[in-house]
């Protein structure tokens, strides 16, 4: 056995992890740097449709239900993007419609958060509340079939209000964003959703008992499968190589 060769091999093997760790030591990127990379590899020509769906449902202890939804779909055939609002409701079979007696205080700064802000504040018993934000990206190269745009057309600066079984529904379009809310009957609480200015807010206040609330906002993006040309690919590869010098 050649002892010197074995010793050389062991020394090389032991040094490789240390060398790799020093060459590819990760560093933390700031929020500003991440913002510069956001969407970098989704070329504008590949996005063939974009849509937003928002919905809020409130069901009280008696089974009374109110649902409000707003949706917008944009593709190559869209002339003027706008939201369409629908509201439905049904009366439950229960008899428990006692007024809520809970009190929720504070929260004045919740509407000034950046990014996605989700809150549930409760002063009752047996309540259930969900806040959901989803992003659905499809790459099949086909735009989703145009859903018949029905309901109330919400113009910029306009609003929509109606009474429903479980509460009063309101939707408004202001300052480049959309806000929807349900103010539940009998002091049971309220639910709010708001999107605009790069921020999403979802909040629920529960002052009664045995309520079920669901807030949902979903962004839908469809990408074409035509791919990137050679120039765009080289540009993206050069950007990735640039990260190598920073430790990636």
Curated annotation (Swiss-Prot):
<comment type="similarity">
    <text>Belongs to the FapE family.</text>
</comment>
<keyword id="KW-0964">Secreted</keyword>
<comment type="function">
    <text>A minor component of the functional amyloid in this bacterium. Upon overexpression of the endogenous six-gene locus (fapA-fapF) in situ, cells form large clumps during liquid growth, make large amounts of biofilm and produce amyloid fibrils. Expression of the 6 gene operon in E.coli strain BL21(DE3) induces flocculation and biofilm formation with copious extracellular fibrils.</text>
</comment>
<comment type="subunit">
    <text>A minor component of purified amyloid fibrils. Fibrils are resistant to boiling in 2% (weight/vol) SDS and require &gt;90% (vol/vol) formic acid to dissolve.</text>
</comment>
<dbReference type="GO" id="GO:0007155">
    <property type="term" value="P:cell adhesion"/>
</dbReference>
<keyword id="KW-0034">Amyloid</keyword>
<feature type="signal peptide">
    <location>
        <begin position="1"/>
        <end position="20"/>
    </location>
</feature>
<keyword id="KW-0732">Signal</keyword>
<keyword id="KW-0130">Cell adhesion</keyword>
<protein>
    <recommendedName>
        <fullName>Functional amyloid sbunit FapE</fullName>
    </recommendedName>
</protein>
<dbReference type="GO" id="GO:0009289">
    <property type="term" value="C:pilus"/>
</dbReference>
<dbReference type="GO" id="GO:0005576">
    <property type="term" value="C:extracellular region"/>
</dbReference>
<keyword id="KW-0281">Fimbrium</keyword>
């Amino acid at each position: 056995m050649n002892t010197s060769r074995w010793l050389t091999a062991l020394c090389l093997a032991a040094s490789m992890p240390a060398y790799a760790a020093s060459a590819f030591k990760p560093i933390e990127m700031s929020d500003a740097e991440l913002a510069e990379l956001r969407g970098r590899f989704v070329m504008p020509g590949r996005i063939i449709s974009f849509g937003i769906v928002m919905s809020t449902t409130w069901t009280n202890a008696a089974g009374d239900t109110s649902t409000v939804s707003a949706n917008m779909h944009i593709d190559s055939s869209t002339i003027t993007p706008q939201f369409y609002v629908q509201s439905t409701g049904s009366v439950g079979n229960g008899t428990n419609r006692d007024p809520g007696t809970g009190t929720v205080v504070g929260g004045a700064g919740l509407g000034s958060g950046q990014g996605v802000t989700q809150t549930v504040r409760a002063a009752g018993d047996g309540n259930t509340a969900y806040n959901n934000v989803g992003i659905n990206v499809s790459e099949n190269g086909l735009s989703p079939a145009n859903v018949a745009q029905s309901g109330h057309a919400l113009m910029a600066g306009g609003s929509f209000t109606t009474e429903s079984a479980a509460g009063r529904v309101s939707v408004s379009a202001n300052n480049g964003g959309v806000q929807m809310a349900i103010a539940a009957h009998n002091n049971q609480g309220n639910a709010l959703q708001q999107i605009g200015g790069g921020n999403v807010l979802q909040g629920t206040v529960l002052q009664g008992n045995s309520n079920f609330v669901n807030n949902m906002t979903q962004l839908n993006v469809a990408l074409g499968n035509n791919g990137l040309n050679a120039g765009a690919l080289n540009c993206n590869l050069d950007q990735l190589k640039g990260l190598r010098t920073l430790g990636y």
